[in-house]
Amino acid sequence: MMTRSRHLVWVALFACAGAGPVAGQDGFGAAVLAPAPDEILVLKPAFGRGAASVLVFERGGSGWSQVQELWSAGSLLGESFGRTMAPVEGGFLAASGDPQVMIGAYGFARGADGAWAESGALPLRAEAAASAEEMSMGRVMAILQPPARVVAADGDVALVSAPGGQGAGTEVRIYARGADGTWSAAGALEAGDLRANARYGAAMAVRGGLAAVGAPGQGSSGTVYLFARGADGGWTRQAALATPALGGGAGLGSSVLFTGDDELAVGAPSADGSVGRVVLFARGPGGGWSETAILLPSAPGSGQRFGTALAAAGDELIVGAPGAEDGRGRVDAFTRVDADGGWRAAHAFAPGEAGLVAGFGSALALRPGLAVVGSPASEGSAGLAAVYEAAEDGSWSGPVWLRAGAPPVAVTSAEVRCEDDRAAGFDCADVDLQAYLPLASIGAEPGERVSDAWGWTDPETGREYGLVGRSGGAAIVDVTDAVNPVYLGVIPANRSGARDLKVYADHLFFTGDGAGAHGLVVFDLTRLRDVADPPVEFAPDLRWDGIGSAHNLIIDTGAGTAFTVSTSGDGHTCGGGLVMIDIRQPLAPEFAGCYTDTEGLIFQGRTHDAQCLVYDGPDMDYRGRELCFASNETALRIVDVTDKSDPRPISAAAYPGVAYIHQGWLSDDRRYFFLDDELDELVGTTDRTKTIVWDVTDLDDPVVIADYYGPNNATDHNLYVKGDRMYQANY
């Protein structure tokens, strides 16, 4: 019979497992489709909260509800989708976002039972391109923000734009669907000479035997290339459309849409200082194309980006302006007034009074009586989609807001045992759930996220507190009664997506990255002994302005030294290395010194994280010295910082296949250092979570002695060691 050791672990699950380094924002609403009057598809291209997916909504007696979630083979492995979808007969295509750029798009088809399922992929190449290139920032960004792919389709023809062709860096590939439903490569659409940054294939459309490919960076104002399919099935370039009168940098071709067999609408969202325009073109009797009209936004204002997205149904055309209304967004509707391509402004869709809406109009879908508007930047880029419906008299109602999944529900009052590998909806193995508080339960507004957690035990009362880094500050939760946690309040600070929190001498210290003049915030935790009527907003005891923003914070509690790393903005930065701060008097910090390394990936000298302590390990040469074990992106660096005016590097070590040395922690006896490399899983140098074990008994010569492989391919992020147990946070 199996028995369990009862170790209580308080984990910051508030953000939900899976937030990647760049993809903490899901972007739900980046693309939308309405394949049927009572059905809507919404793309969630990133994996901030669960795998990237397409969510299916149906209209029932009680309104719109999610009925299915679709994943690709790639998204189930942690890959993103692109940001476009295209309908095809019996299904749709969703652009891929795999970092290896092996897949152009994934196909989905409706089964006999009406449910959707993946139906195959449109491959770009058979295997990933081999690369002998060492890890660089360029490779990192290609992994974290994979090259964009765009998909368009009509009938049995699909177009995919992807990196790799022509001098401008992209190519547009043609795919044909066979009788068995599989897609195969059928050539490419070649525009001819393209300049660098033409962004060829940024937007595409297909209708019958015509294809339109936008290149918003080509020429002075952007260009759209038109191709026609011949009797032999081959495609030839027919025209290059431009409107120089729009002015330089207009971005013509950022969106394209056939509004008829001989009509084309083209967005130029950067025209006129990013107010935006939509240019209408028509094919004449002789086969030539010419400009027929230019559509303007329904209201004045700069930065509207009118023309970012287009959708049409019958004699209705809608145009997205996601920058309108101070970034909230708007969608303008137009009605055809004559057969010669004339359009008039009809009405506008607005997000109403809903809070935290941003980028409304970034994606559109339209069918008679139904409009769907994507708003992927809303709620902190978690994303929203809005549904509008028309009455018989032509009036529109809405919005009805769609979100990715039901809001999480708090789990409190009683322990939930792990049974059949599940506990209250979470996967588990030999770990029972004491409680779960979603973001809303710790005071977070929609769109906030959580990026770090620490803890404090009151030495007088024995009460335990969780300290949680929220976008809007540091949230404090009393976890003394583990199954009944109580949210006490928040210490507000400049908004940040990446915080670090540590405790010294009964004081909380925390930082924020990318948060301007955030400073080092200090809060006396003994104030928690008498909190009336929680939750409350706590005023910090100090904001030390010796630094601006910082990615991570380390505290050596033995020496009373704080270290910020990857520090930026005003104040001390130390080139991204160790900013040393004397905090022996918590409310009177003093700058103590700098250490800037020669290692680094994002830039030379950048330290990502560290563990610093008064060394009490086996290497007698350094006993009693204050040392930092620094994760410096490309190497593990051990530094003697006892003399803050003259820190001395002791050693640096790496290993074959290093991708990004992120963080690590010493064993309690100081003989071993356990390290996580954040990117090795993502770049493919390991197929499972790998923890690297160093023998550091000789600090002058650290040696890798083992690798521990986890049971899945999650990316390792942070780990801590207490006694004979290691606690890892992976995504």
Question: Which sequence ranges carry the predicted segments?
Answer:
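Initiator methionine at the very start of the polypeptide chain
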Residues: 1-2, 24
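Feature marking well-ordered beta-strand scaffolds used for ligand recognition
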Residues: 22-731
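Bacterial N-terminal signal peptides
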Residues: 10-18
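Bacterial N-terminal signal peptides that target proteins for export
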Residues: 2-9
